[in-house]
Curated annotation (Swiss-Prot):
This is Outer membrane protein assembly factor BamB. The gene is bamB. One of its GO terms (biological process) is Gram-negative-bacterium-type cell outer membrane assembly. It is found in: Cell outer membrane. Part of the outer membrane protein assembly complex, which is involved in assembly and insertion of beta-barrel proteins into the outer membrane. InterPro entries: BamB, PQQ_b-propeller_rpt, PQQ_rpt_dom, Quinoprotein_ADH-like_sf, WD40/YVTN_repeat-like_dom_sf. A lipid is attached at C26 (N-palmitoyl cysteine). The lineage of its organism: Bacteria, Pseudomonadati, Pseudomonadota, Gammaproteobacteria, Pseudomonadales.
Length: 390
């Protein structure tokens, strides 16, 4: 979950948690809520570990979001202290490892040729997928915390102060820049942009979703996910920090203290919307929409009419990750490093495992072989199967 921008020392881990909890508890009524304790459950499913490893020092005490990149048979993972790994999805065998000289600030993006990351010194760096060697680097105006995205010819990075920049994937030449507006107070975060062949879609702390031409970065349309309301800057937060979800010719997007909406990707016209508040992208599966609300409730909506099917509140304020659909379950992580499995039919908690005592910020990922990839804040990385207990 993002934190308030420029209000937390990069090494202030415990201060960061306190401010994060305070933010999570702030609403139009300025209510502060403590995270509920880990719920006691009667588990009917288990997280069975297939393999595990350590990726450097993970986030190394910084409030980062170093999501691994999964492509085909390999997982590419990085730590803040510069450890890079390419790992076989099936066995966890290391294909190659590399020590990067700079401190890493973003998760990995990639295309058919390169991997992309950003550094603490605000550089965008391209690395070879074959061995992790540096291909090119270029300077960015300010820090980037979200993974750079590429369509094979264009690499796009979005800074925390609202700039979206396009670069040549071949040599890092800057091709264009779009300057978005940023309110006085915002999350120290930015959603990774969506990069297609002709269009780039980016979301902003101003509560806007904006489509840009991939060729020149010129705006095509914009959609208001949230409109600032209230008297205080906290009340007026409307950040969109989750990457929009593409569904055929539309994108689904959700904002903090805003709404959940489906928008035509060609025109920006709203197809439908409903009130919602979340910091992460929604997930869909089995005709339902799943959302981790800002207050820690997990909500299932019927896709056909967006009516609420169930709500799970036993993980309230536990700073959950984005839910991941896995077979008949939803999987989320939390700030104390627990993994939780929910039954998709009724939202009941059916499985639980303690994974990383430094917490889990990156959502689990479903691998092509059906297993589940989990990355913890300390750098623990593991693959699990979620299955009924014997």
């Amino acid at each position: 979950m993002p934190v308030l921008r420029d209000r937390i020392p990069r090494r202030g881990f415990f201060l960061g948690l306190a401010l994060l909890a305070a933010l999570s508890g702030c609403s139009s009524t300025d209510t502060f809520e403590q995270p509920v304790p880990v719920p006691e459950i009667e588990a009917s499913v288990e997280f069975e570990r297939v393999w595990s490893m350590s990726v450097g020092d993970g986030h190394d005490g910084d409030f980062l979001y170093l999501a691994p990149l999964v492509t085909g048979d390999l997982i590419y993972a990085a730590s803040a202290d510069g450890e890079l790994y390419a790992v076989a999805t099936e066995t966890g065998e290391v294909a190659w490892e590399s020590e990067f000289e700079d401190r890493i600030f973003s998760g990995l993006g990639g295309d058919g040729q390169n991997l992309y990351l950003t550094t603490e010194n605000a550089d965008l760096v391209a690395l070879s997928r074959e061995d992790g060697s540096e291909v090119w680097r270029t300077s960015l105006p300010t820090e980037v915390l979200s993974s750079p995205q590429s369509n094979g010819s264009l690499v796009v990075a979005q800074t925390t102060d609202g700039k979206v920049l396009g670069f040549s994937a071949t040599d890092g030449e800057k091709l264009w820049q779009y300057d978005g507006s940023v309110p006085v107070l915002s999350m120290r975060a930015a959603a990774a942009p969506l990069v297609g062949g002709d269009v780039v879609i980016a979301s902003f702390a101003s509560g806007k979703l904006i489509a840009l031409t991939a060729a020149s970065g010129q705006p095509m349309w914009q959609y208001e996910v949230g409109q600032p309301q209230g008297r205080t800057e906290l009340e007026r937060l409307v950040d969109v920090t989750g990457q929009p979800l593409v569904i055929e010719t539309a994108v689904m997007v959700v904002g903090y203290q805003g709404k959940l909406a489906l928008v035509d990707i060609r025109t920006g016209q709203e197809i439908w919307s409903r009130k919602a508040s979340s910091l992460y992208s929604p997930m869909i599966g089995g005709g339902q929409i799943y959302l981790a609300a800002a207050d820690g409730e997990i909500i299932a909506l019927r896709g056909s009419d967006r009516r609420e099917v169930w709500t799970q509140d036993r993980l309230a304020w536990r700073q959950l990750t984005q839910p991941m659909v896995y077979e008949d379950y939803l999987v989320v992580g939390d700030f104390e490093g627990y993994l939780h499995a929910l039954d998709r039919e009724d939202g009941s908690l059916v499985g639980q495992r303690e994974f990383d005592d430094e917490g889990i910020r990156v959502p689990a990922q479903r691998l092509a072989n059906g297993n589940l990839l989990v990355f913890g804040n300390s750098g623990k990385m593991a693959v699990f199967q979620v299955k009924p207990q014997d």
